[in-house]
Design a protein with these regions (language model features):
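Active-site-proximal cap/loop segments of hydrolase catalytic domains
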Residues: 618-807
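Active-site proximal helix/loop that lines the substrate pocket
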Residues: 589-592, 620
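Intrinsically disordered, low-complexity segments used as extracellular stalks/linkers
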Residues: 11, 16, 20-26, 30-31, ...
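Structural cue for short, hydrophobic secondary-structure segments
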Residues: 586-589, 615
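A fold-wide structural signal in alpha/beta-hydrolase
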Residues: 607-617, 773
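Alpha/beta-hydrolase fold active-site loops
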Residues: 582
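Peripheral, non-catalytic segments that deliver or gate enzyme domains
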Residues: 2-18, 22-25, 65-111, 115-135, ...
């Protein structure tokens, strides 16, 4: 491995950092300091042969880090880091250049450029499933690099141009693997995530391209025994192989709320997490403290903590972040390890490898952590915003840190801090902020000089470029409303929403979506004017000829308690302006997602049946400030259910929706809201379509992935301490009120919201004489990624809605 990676563990920590302080007490808003102590793995030059496990004096096999060093025990008695992932070579799976296009109306997204900026790796579904492709930014041909059936999720081209790393979701499920392949399609290999029950997530590359960071998730407890009813097959037999069933009894009614044994936490009382931890400024932190304005945001000196819930009850997976050499010249290097964690991602490494920028924590409680890699001392912790996981980066000399953060603010801004030689912040400044708008994407060019910012303005994107002379910051207490001044440049976008920004040497590449086109990739050859890549589908090919996509109009409902709401109304073509029409209220997932004005083939199908669509953002949605996101926490969820009814009333009073022909529909959390709305407001809707929705929050916690449970406990309530609240919020509790027919859809490999949630609601509806049907999609997880299944789903849903609303 090159010197960049070796520097992570080379030398004596005290010699390199003479000013290093002893481990300090953790501030009260960032968790427990000793929950999952990281272990250092010293890389050794070796051949591709793995070293065998060593034997202890007692004769038992000792787990090692992959380089022969024993793994230290964590403070809770569990191993702090799990065995390093083993590299698995795979056969060449690249396709021919410019393979025949199966789907004309295809999407391209998630671009990553080679060092020259002339070629892009990207994800494209022209073959019917998201796959890894590469091609020149300004021409043809393109090439398929992995023709396997597993959907691709993320892509990253190495800084030296020799490798392309990417993640796949075997079986379409929630567990992912990290792979690498040469740009010509050779040397394809699995880097992590092949072990049964594990999952792997892609991080950043070392800046010299010698290694890539990967987070490996390993269950902290043994899987439950298979259920005799076969629930283990429905919940988890897919992506990571058999053996990760959840032991659920599909024949039971309401759950007793007991957690599986693998979620039993350490001693201590559990509690519902209250308001967002970053809203309550709390007591002053012990000195020295890093502050934004007058608000303490973290203290240096502590080791990396785990992600446990208050009171010591944790039920996340064990997460270990490694630096892995795809050439297999050096052993994996452990960067950090935590237990009972929701997330852990390495977002950046300093050029010399001495500092790592980590993102950790459940949604609503994300944090940026600066870690010294030599001694695993935390030098800075700062709350950061949800959304895009790539939260920021170091400057080229690691003398500054740039972050997308909403620490003690309603909206995310660009913050920078000067760093001392040990990685401690010397002070913070606000570089860019906008009143009422979130900074949702942040990218610095590879030379670290230019920042590209994407702002979310009521669901629409605005892209701003900060040149080097403008990146000087404003006063810490300042709240600039329009960036940093007239020197910043704005990019005129051909479509409404930017989903990704990547630098392409001296140029940029943007992934765009819009209300009238499929996702595509644009590049900026002159740095100012986006040009569509030739292999992205044309606007006119977005839908079949004859019926163009509908551009939505914004609506602004008001909740019964006075809270302003937002949404987008789609009018079915061919109707007079004031003509009452059947209307589908469509609810997004999250709950922190946001309805964006982008083309959805499902909407296009429904609109073609003569049905209007109103897609609101009820409380809990992102894009309108942190207070709005947190407005549905705990018992605030009841107000979110009222928001659905209030938005429906607004669609009738302010729009052309026919009050006698209304339906409710949603996916994931939106599926939960659909189930709940049908039993909370049984006379409001004629029918409902729930997609991958929760019907009983107790059984949801029993069956979901541990890291998802970590985040969900913050949003809905803790499954032990708040059992009664979860029972009140569960649609199954009020199933006797159901009147309207319901259509449920679920992916067979969904381990986010297991299929049991749809099965038990449909079964209960039928037992009460209410028409109900369930569509289970094969080889799909929580997201439907295969073209044939997506087509089946949207046609079946539209058929159901048309039948019940036009009868």
């Amino acid at each position: 491995m090159a010197s960049n990676a070796r520097n992570l563990t080379a030398g004596d920590a005290t010699a390199r950092h003479p000013a290093a302080e002893p481990v300090a007490e953790r501030p009260p808003d960032v968790g427990t300091a000793d929950a999952g102590r990281p272990a250092t793995v010293r890389p050794e030059e070796r051949t591709t042969d793995e070293r065998p496990a060593e034997r202890t004096e007692e004769g038992t096999e000792e787990r090692t880090d992959g380089a022969g060093a024993p793994l230290p025990a964590g403070s809770d008695g569990l191993t702090a880091a799990f065995a390093a992932p083993a590299r698995i070579p795979l056969p060449d799976a690249s396709g021919p250049r410019d393979a025949p296009t199966r789907l004309i109306a295809h999407g391209c997204w998630y671009p990553s450029a080679d060092p020259s900026g002339t070629r892009l790796a990207f994800i494209c579904d022209r073959g019917g499933v998201p796959q890894l492709w590469t091609g020149p930014a300004d021409g043809e041909p393109v090439r398929l690099l992995d023709d396997g059936p597993d959907p691709v999720r993320e892509v990253s081209w190495s800084p030296d141009g020799r490798w392309i790393a990417y993640t796949t979701a075997p079986g379409g499920g929630e567990h992912t693997r990290v792979l690498c392949v040469r740009p010509d399609g050779s040397d394809r290999q699995i880097l992590a995530g092949a072990e049964p029950g594990s999952s792997a997530h892609l991080g950043c590359w070392a800046h010299d391209g010698s290694a890539v960071t990967v987070t490996v998730a390993v269950p902290t407890g043994p899987p439950a025994p298979p259920s005799p009813s076969g629930a283990d097959t429905a919940a988890g037999d897919g992506p990571s192989g058999p053996g990760r069933g959840f032991g659920l009894d599909l024949g039971s009614g309401l759950s007793d709320g007991r957690l599986p044994d693998r979620w039993r936490g350490r001693a201590g009382e559990t509690e519902l997490l209250g308001p967002a931890p970053h809203t309550d400024r709390g007591p002053a932190l012990p000195s020295p403290a890093v502050t934004v304005g007058t608000t303490p945001i973290g203290a240096p000196g502590g080791t990396l903590p785990g992600g446990t819930l208050p009171g010591g009850t944790g039920f996340g997976d064990g997460l270990s972040a490694y630096l892995i050499d795809p050439d297999a010249v050096a052993a994996p290097v452990l960067i950090a390890a935590v237990q009972d964690a929701a997330t852990l991602r390495v977002c950046d490494l300093s050029r010399d490898g001495s500092l790592a920028l980590l993102r950790r924590g459940p949604r609503g409680r994300r944090e940026a952590v600066v870690l010294r890699t030599a001694d695993h001392v935390t030098t800075c912790v700062l709350p950061v915003a949800d959304g895009d996981p790539w939260i920021g980066s170091f400057s080229p000399r690691a003398d500054a840190l740039r972050l997308r953060s909403n620490a003690h603010r309603e909206f995310a801004v660009l913050l920078t801090a000067e760093l001392d030689p040990d990685g401690r912040p010397l002070g913070w400044s606000t570089v860019a902020a906008r009143e009422g708008s979130d900074l949702e994407l942040l990218r610095y060019t590879r030379d670290g000089a230019t920042a590209v910012l994407a702002w979310n303005i009521r669901g629409m994107s605005d892209v701003e470029i900060l040149d080097p002379d403008t990146d000087t910051g404003t006063d810490t207490d300042g709240r600039p409303e329009e960036g940093t001044g007239s020197a910043s440049r704005h990019i005129s976008l051909p479509h409404e929403v930017v989903t990704r920004v990547t630098d392409a040497n001296s140029r940029l590449a943007l992934a765009l979506s819009g209300s009238r086109r499929r996702p595509g990739i644009w590049w900026l050859p002159d740095g100012a004017t986006p040009v569509r890549t030739p292999w992205s589908s044309r606007d006119e090919d977005a839908v079949p000829p004859g019926r163009p996509p509908v551009r939505p109009v914004p609506l602004r409902p008001t909740a019964r308690d006075g809270l302003p709401l937002n949404g987008w109304y789609y009018r079915a073509p061919g109707r007079a302006p004031g003509e009452p029409a059947p209307c589908v209220i469509h609810l997004h997932g999250g709950p922190e997602d946001q309805e964006r004005p982008v083309l959805d083939p499902l909407y296009h199908e429904i609109l073609g049946r003569g049905l209007d669509i109103f897609a609101p953002d009820v409380r809990g949605s992102s894009g309108y400030g942190r207070s709005f996101v947190d407005a549905d926490l705990g018992r605030g969820r009841f107000a979110a259910l009222d928001d659905v009814a209030d938005c429906t009333a607004h669609a009738v009073l302010a729009g052309p929706a026919d009050p006698s022909r209304l339906a409710v529909m949603g996916r994931s959390y939106g599926g939960y809201l659909t189930f709940a709305s049908l039993v909370w407001h049984p006379d409001l809707f004629r029918t409902g379509v729930a997609v991958c929705g929760m019907s009983d929050l107790a059984t949801f916690f029993e069956g979901t992935e541990p890291w998802i449970a970590q985040s969900a406990a913050h949003k809905y309530g803790h499954p032990e301490r708040d059992r009664e609240l979860l029972r009140e919020l569960s649609p199954m509790t009020r199933i006797d009120a159901l009147r309207a027919p319901v259509f449920a859809v679920h992916g067979e490999h969904d381990t986010n919201v297991p299929p049991r949630e749809s099965e038990q609601f449909v079964r209960a509806a039928r037992e009460r004489g209410v028409p109900a049907e369930l569509l289970t999609l094969r080889e799909e997880g929580h997201d439907f990624l295969r073209a044939d299944n997506r087509r089946l789903f949207r046609r079946a849903a539209a058929d159901w809605l048309q039948r019940h609303l036009n009868s």
